[in-house]
């Protein structure tokens, strides 16, 4: 049985876990005393143009200026008489002192400021509104086959405002055109409110704050395969119920329950130990093998070891079976630890080319469950595979990563 567990008893931390039986498969954590800025929208002011980087630095109201690269500037800011957009330089588009509406794409990290974009996105239950992307009619890459074909027809019937675009989310599959239009209308109204706020306020300032972790998780993860939603805080329970009522999600209202047990919620469902295990460098595999996860400034390295693995009658078969088993666990660890950036996997050497291709295919398959954008390479002659993953940015996971990195230096 798949469940969503919302642990909101602690004053400074709110945690949401998704479990299948007793196995944790996704985790969202928010520290209440730490600001969440990702996806917030600001009215900012250009403070410096850097031609050598083809980027601008934007004061959006925080201590560090944000970084706005040329590729993240929508054509709304381009000169009206421009006929060749591809050869424009940033100094021909933006000027120091100019005001702009920006959204945080990546949180600031270390000495680096936040990565900004002018391609605003407003996520709804079933679709994403892109107000600066004219004529965009996108469908989630995870939607395939007949569902994709059916949604292409529905998109053409939706009343999308001129000069705006949309992307249908996986949760939009099977929804009626009326439901999708209602969600779209709500996002459009939200965008007009944001624009109005930008008109009446002086830069730099916050003009739209992303929803809290409870609403975000319900919006992004709530699907019909979730059979129970269990909350240990009555106030959060009512917040979730109100959201479901407002979004016409009556299907889930019967599934949400208040937890009143004497044991802590996560301990009762035996996932606290799984969360604590995310601090460990070594992850054991059922067959006796293991994966070792090391964090560096440049990349994350994942090493697969056969150790005491009993899967196989010879070296080649043991290597293939251990690698195959490790791939599923690696995909799970990427989600739970929210590993982002460059990731290098060191597989156990396999001499059979067919085995290497099967491992690559298996990795692609298990990564389809990941909400983050992922790019995967091929296994090299040295047994290494390079991939990149979008960091979705849970604060506690970042703290865990920093803790591990410091421990490795000791």
Swiss-Prot record:
Record field: catalytic activity: Endonucleolytic cleavage of single-stranded RNA in A- and U-rich regions
Q: Name one Pfam family in it.
A: RNase_E_G
The organism's superkingdom is given as Bacteria
Family annotation (Gene3D superfamilies): Nucleic acid-binding proteins (2.40.50.140)
Is rRNA-binding found in the keyword set? Answer: yes
Which residues hold Mg(2+)?
303, 346
Subcellular localization is given as:
Cytoplasm; Cell inner membrane
Topology versus the membrane: Peripheral membrane protein
Which InterPro entries does the annotation name?
Answer: NA-bd_OB-fold (IPR012340), RNA-bd_AU-1/RNase_E/G (IPR019307), RNase_E/G (IPR004659), S1_domain (IPR003029)
Cofactors named for this entry = Mg(2+)
Q: Quaternary structure? A: Component of the RNA degradosome, which is a multiprotein complex involved in RNA processing and mRNA degradation. Within the RNA degradosome, RNase E assembles into a homotetramer formed by a dimer of dimers.
* Protein family membership: Belongs to the RNase E/G family. RNase E subfamily.
Q: What does this protein do?
A: Endoribonuclease that plays a central role in RNA processing and decay. Required for the maturation of 5S and 16S rRNAs and the majority of tRNAs. Also involved in the degradation of most mRNAs.
What protein is this chain from? Putative ribonuclease E
Species this protein is from: Buchnera aphidicola subsp. Baizongia pistaciae (strain Bp)
Lineage of this protein's species? Bacteria, Pseudomonadati, Pseudomonadota, Gammaproteobacteria, Enterobacterales
Gene assigned in the entry: rne
